Amino acid sequence: MAKKYFGTDGIRGLVNSRHINGDMFFKFGLASGTYFKTQKKNKQIAIIAKDTRLSGYALEPALVSGLTSAGMHVYTMGPLPTNGLAMLTKSMKANMGIMITASHNPHYDNGLKLFGPDGLKLSDKIEKKIE
């Protein structure tokens, strides 16, 4: 069965559309936090970074709320390159890293890219479980 939200490299789309809005970012935070919390028994850590799109500053609090509702300790790092977040996720032994970005898409888009504790992009299988 096809994935509902995740594309080839995370979730992307027009800000304030069907799945790129505060409500959905809360739900993605809650779902991903719940999944990763079951995968690691010690302190539950999620690290969030973003690119410099203005919409990231509006969407980030909803994502943090979802993650903390799932019992995660959240560190917000501010603007970072995507590969910097991947490295931090692994070196800080976090459960997960979430990058708020739409990569090369236009400025009016935004999205999420999730990394596992190894600092690598999530597998299709894990993305499907989070959905």
Label the model's feature ranges.
Residues A2-E131:
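Gly/Ser-rich phosphate-binding catalytic loop and adjacent alpha/beta segment
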